[in-house]
Amino acid sequence: MGSLSIWHWIVVIAVVLLLFGRGKISDLMGDVAQGIKSFKKGLQDDEKTAEKPDAVKSLDHNATTGTPPNRTDVGSKAV
């Protein structure tokens, strides 16, 4: 009882054709195809316009500056 036979599918297709008609179904399928094409084109455009990340800048940790960094102890109290 739970499965649909070929006759069930034929009846369902016949009812759909009677309700919507051949013209509306073909128009609907054309709109779906056009939407899929637009979606794929949008995905391709996004890949083309994606910017490359900037080059990684490295810092020289051994470089000395004229003034030492300002270091304060957070937990210490001034005496």
Curated annotation (Swiss-Prot):
One Pfam family recorded for the sequence: TatA_B_E
Gene Ontology CC terms: TAT protein transport complex
A biological-process GO annotation: protein transport by the Tat complex
Organism domain of life: Bacteria
UniProt keyword list: Cell inner membrane, Cell membrane, Membrane, Protein transport, Translocation, Transmembrane, Transmembrane helix, Transport
Spans annotated as Disordered: 42-79
Subcellular location(s) per record: Cell inner membrane
Main function: Part of the twin-arginine translocation (Tat) system that transports large folded proteins containing a characteristic twin-arginine motif in their signal peptide across membranes. TatA could form the protein-conducting channel of the Tat system.
UniProt name for this protein: Sec-independent protein translocase protein TatA
